[in-house]
Amino acid sequence: MKKTNPKATKTVYPIICQIVNVIPHQFIAEAAKAHKVLSRTFTPKSHVAAMLYCQVSKTESLNSICDVAAANEALWTSMGVTVPRRNTFSNANAMRPSAMAKDLYWRTYNYLIGIAPDFGRRAHRGYCSRVKAPMFAVDSSTIKLTMNSFDWARHRREKAAAKLHMTLDLGNRLPSFAVVEDAAHHDSVRAAELTAHLRRGDIAVADRAYTDFGFMNGLDARGVWFVTRQKRNMKMEVVRRLMEPAAATGERKTQILADEIVVPAKKSTAAKYAGTLRRVTAVVEVQGQMKTMMFLTNNLKWSARTVAEIYRDRWGIETFFKELKQTCQIHDFIGYSENAVQWQVWIGLLAHLILRYLRYLSKWGLSFSRLAALVRGTLWNRRRLIETLRLYGTASPVKSPARKPKPLYFQAVFDFPSAAVGQQTP
């Protein structure tokens, strides 16, 4: 079947409008009312639309957003919003509570999960499918800022940064909880808050920054399984060996070196975690290199290889952070206050969620960065977005029809002799 490029038509809204319309209109009004956002001309919907355009187009300044909106005023106002003015837009980012953007994100998240259950249940390639319990990765990502402009985010003598703490559902690779704040606090400070919503039987996976005996004891008391890495300075006493120690073979696959039951060796740490832990030592591949790692868990029934593979799935949250920063505007900020930064990060998460949902609807088969680039390049086109994504994302490149060789008219007109130069033809 021949695929044709979807034609532009006046009856279809521009693609930026179709992206904004993924969010039910009443959600913006309800979130604004819940957080007492007052407005006259620059409505909350106008604010959200401008911020979504900033994220999807990766625009770096307020002036650029306002200029593009003014240049495309007829298309911009077709969304039912007003063209932003620089000062009004800047004041909205600084004064309107960022809790509205956070609230809007979770309203939209729950709505999309509700209307498309498969979108919320989809497991990615490499997921440890033999583990049926829900798995959640806990981690944070640092967002570098300029100390001269973002003095509220100063956390070292000459550095400033914000931090995005997150609990990611490893099944669908979508956030289940997130916190945006300055980077002055250690990751472990937010550990209990990030895992408060986990239920009995869920699995929490975290790196060494969250390895704390008090935190692990709280998870164990609630019936939550955990897999984390042992810190280098942790002193553990071996109670029982579940397998004899082995040596690494040099093969490029997960190798189990030791499987032990351990307890904290110091009295001070033993008071924080009174139970026993299981320590699995394995050689795993990290960024193309084989490394030896020690994992701690409170589950004694899983196989040692399953423990290592569960921790391997934790790297899905690293992929999420990389994907978010590559496709959304999380590097350059259009506002300097803490509230403005939080607005931009939460709308960045919202834009990422919408793009992920569009990828699900269109059955996009290429990389996520290519989808974001295609959407970015067609924001003002009047084309049906899903049809456009299906054309470019699911099919192999269309082969051009084979061309018939053209007749050699030059040779037909002039009958060249076949004999060599200087010879006479018979």
Where would I find each of the regions flagged by the language model?
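Short Lys/Arg-enriched helix C-cap and helix-to-coil transition segments
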Residues: M100-A116
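Catalytic micro-motifs at enzyme active sites that drive phosphoryl/nucleotidyl and oxygen chemistry
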Residues: T77-S78, R122-G126, W152-R156, F215
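Extended, structured, electrostatic nucleic-acid-contact surfaces
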Residues: A70-M79
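Short acidic (Asp/Glu) patches
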Residues: A74-L75, D118-R121, N148-R154, H185, ...
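Long amphipathic N-terminal alpha/beta scaffold segment
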Residues: I113-S129, L145
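Major-groove recognition helix of helix-turn-helix-like DNA-binding domains
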Residues: S78-R96
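Single, function-defining residue in the core of a domain
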Residues: M1-S64, V68, R96, D103-R107, ...
